[in-house]
Amino acid sequence: MSEGQKFQLGTIGALSLSVVSSVSIVICNKALISTLGFTFATTLTSWHLLVTFCSLHVALWMKMFEHKPFDPRAVMGFGILNGISIGLLNLSLGFNSVGFYQMTKLAIIPCTVLLETLFFRKKFSRKIQFSLTILLLGVGIATVTDLQLNMLGSVLSLLAVVTTCVAQIMTNTIQKKFKVSSTQLLYQSCPYQAITLFVTGPFLDGLLTNQNVFAFKYTSQVVFFIVLSCLISVSVNFSTFLVIGKTSPVTYQVLGHLKTCLVLAFGYVLLRDPFDWRNILGILVAVIGMVVYSYYCSIETQQKASETSTQLPQMKESEKDPLIAAENGSGVLSDGGGGVQQKTVAPVWNSNKDFQA
């Protein structure tokens, strides 16, 4: 099996793990929040991250992955930003209608595209933009109902969108810049995320629910679903970093909308949640957008791979030409008295090459 095939197989596995684990945790949390009345979402998320860190620490002790420390300030900033984005999303849901909150989630994709275009010079083809538009239109039809606006809720939603986009872009860029795996990044950033939410969680949950998480009556059933939710969250957090590292923040958001459609369908089929033709139409349009997006992404990936493969032989041919080699600094021609000799000279190392255009 070639490296390309292994990478594709790993990407498919990461996407599948993300879908299965995310849908599972939504079902578990729905039972915990809606049925059992445990509405402390931010505090629950801090417990998720704490269990994830402990699980990764055990995996490190068992030598299932290698610890690779890197810039501590980058890790701390990234972890705290991730925690803040989760808290802001929960506040956005608390201070807005469900319909406006869904619009907030839809805004993450165009915001991510805008930020990557402005700051990373990443280009999104018209075909990709078209497929994303179809996807967002479909999810909007399926999920957005009422749009009640208020000033505080709008500001919180804006901050939630920006912090979420930046955090997901950082998840991708940090892995590539410092050459760390998704597991290594998650292991180092988890404590900062957990502490941020552990400190702010009870306050935010109290603000949103008018209840105290420490005064809640923890029955055996509630404890069971909390433990189950925390165990599933290990897979959710791991697959999130894995998907963003292997693909892109935009692809991860597309996957997130697929999960939304699956949860809606699951709620209708098994739980008999209210469902109408608008939901069905929206899901169908969204699925079409996802299929088109996946198709165009695979086509562009193949084109880039073929361009790279055609450039390599040309580079090798240019290295064989002494005149081109001389221009590149890999060799010089000198008169050695009786004839022409070629002397190899190492190219001059420029430490600032990464900062030059």
Curated annotation (Swiss-Prot):
<keyword id="KW-0813">Transport</keyword>
<comment type="function">
    <text>Nucleotide-sugar transporter that transports UDP-xylose and UMP in a strict counter-exchange mode.</text>
</comment>
<comment type="similarity">
    <text>Belongs to the TPT transporter family. TPT (TC 2.A.7.9) subfamily.</text>
</comment>
<feature type="transmembrane region" description="Helical">
    <location>
        <begin position="154"/>
        <end position="174"/>
    </location>
</feature>
<keyword id="KW-0762">Sugar transport</keyword>
<dbReference type="GO" id="GO:0005794">
    <property type="term" value="C:Golgi apparatus"/>
</dbReference>
<feature type="transmembrane region" description="Helical">
    <location>
        <begin position="7"/>
        <end position="27"/>
    </location>
</feature>
<feature type="transmembrane region" description="Helical">
    <location>
        <begin position="280"/>
        <end position="300"/>
    </location>
</feature>
<protein>
    <recommendedName>
        <fullName>UDP-xylose transporter 3</fullName>
    </recommendedName>
</protein>
<feature type="transmembrane region" description="Helical">
    <location>
        <begin position="100"/>
        <end position="120"/>
    </location>
</feature>
<feature type="transmembrane region" description="Helical">
    <location>
        <begin position="224"/>
        <end position="244"/>
    </location>
</feature>
<keyword id="KW-1133">Transmembrane helix</keyword>
<dbReference type="GO" id="GO:0005802">
    <property type="term" value="C:trans-Golgi network"/>
</dbReference>
<dbReference type="GO" id="GO:0015297">
    <property type="term" value="F:antiporter activity"/>
</dbReference>
<feature type="transmembrane region" description="Helical">
    <location>
        <begin position="75"/>
        <end position="95"/>
    </location>
</feature>
<keyword id="KW-0472">Membrane</keyword>
<feature type="modified residue" description="Phosphoserine">
    <location>
        <position position="334"/>
    </location>
</feature>
<dbReference type="InterPro" id="IPR050186">
    <property type="entry name" value="TPT_transporter"/>
</dbReference>
<dbReference type="GO" id="GO:0015790">
    <property type="term" value="P:UDP-xylose transmembrane transport"/>
</dbReference>
<dbReference type="GO" id="GO:0000139">
    <property type="term" value="C:Golgi membrane"/>
</dbReference>
<dbReference type="InterPro" id="IPR004853">
    <property type="entry name" value="Sugar_P_trans_dom"/>
</dbReference>
<feature type="transmembrane region" description="Helical">
    <location>
        <begin position="132"/>
        <end position="152"/>
    </location>
</feature>
<feature type="transmembrane region" description="Helical">
    <location>
        <begin position="250"/>
        <end position="270"/>
    </location>
</feature>
<keyword id="KW-0333">Golgi apparatus</keyword>
<dbReference type="GO" id="GO:0005464">
    <property type="term" value="F:UDP-xylose transmembrane transporter activity"/>
</dbReference>
<keyword id="KW-0597">Phosphoprotein</keyword>
<dbReference type="Pfam" id="PF03151">
    <property type="entry name" value="TPT"/>
</dbReference>
<feature type="transmembrane region" description="Helical">
    <location>
        <begin position="31"/>
        <end position="51"/>
    </location>
</feature>
<dbReference type="GO" id="GO:0005768">
    <property type="term" value="C:endosome"/>
</dbReference>
<keyword id="KW-0812">Transmembrane</keyword>
<keyword id="KW-0050">Antiport</keyword>
<feature type="transmembrane region" description="Helical">
    <location>
        <begin position="194"/>
        <end position="214"/>
    </location>
</feature>
